[in-house]
A protein has these predicted regions:
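Terminal low-complexity/charged segments
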Residues: 1-179
């Protein structure tokens, strides 16, 4: 997540460069108060903040996703009430194997916030259905096509592939000629 228009920030939302004239001239993200509220209420949950082309992405601890989303949805003034999308990505040559990406929208702030959680080989994370019931089919799709297991999901079964299909076609190690 780097490039010419990318700015990495620490967990507190401050530029990672640590000061100086360049940091002072850096525009403040409209979601800086949201990041500050999360880091205040959930120390250690936000691992990294990235601003890219006006969009804010938070790398978060996987075991904290549900409580972060619950807070973001319920906290007055934040109210990220809509789960726009949830997807999973399989990586082969990284220290983590999966990323689960959550895109949230706040009608109150007219803003979107992206959360990313990185998972190891086991590919397990808690379901978000208790906070966003609409996560149901998104999680089933990620389970079916990528192989991420959403623990506590009320009906985690295949949604696109046949029940007896024993592969995940969106994994990077899926055979190019099919299965």
């Amino acid at each position: 997540m780097t490039g010419p228009n990318t700015e990495k920030r620490g967990a507190d939302g401050a530029p990672a460069s640590g000061g100086g004239a360049a940091a002072a001239a850096t525009p403040i993200s409209p979601l800086a108060p949201v990041v500050a509220a999360l880091t205040e209420h959930f120390p250690g949950a936000v691992l990294e903040t990235v601003e890219y082309r006006g969009e804010t992405t938070l790398l978060v601890a996987p075991d904290r996703v549900v409580e972060l989303c619950r807070f973001l949805k319920a906290e007055p003034g934040l109210e990220f009430a809509l789960l726009v999308d949830l997807c999973a990505i399989h990586w082969m040559d990284r220290e983590y194997v999966y990323e689960v990406v959550y895109l949230l929208h706040s009608f109150v702030r007219n803003a979107r916030l992206r959360l990313k959680a990185r998972l190891g080989e086991a590919g397990r994370i808690s379901t978000l259905t208790s906070v966003h019931p609409g996560a149901d089919w998104h999680e089933r799709e990620a389970f079916d096509l990528v192989g991420v297991v959403f623990e506590g999901h009320p009906d985690l079964r295949r949604i696109l592939m046949p029940e007896d299909y024993d592969a995940n076609p969106l994994r990077k190690d899926f055979p190019m000629k099919g299965y």
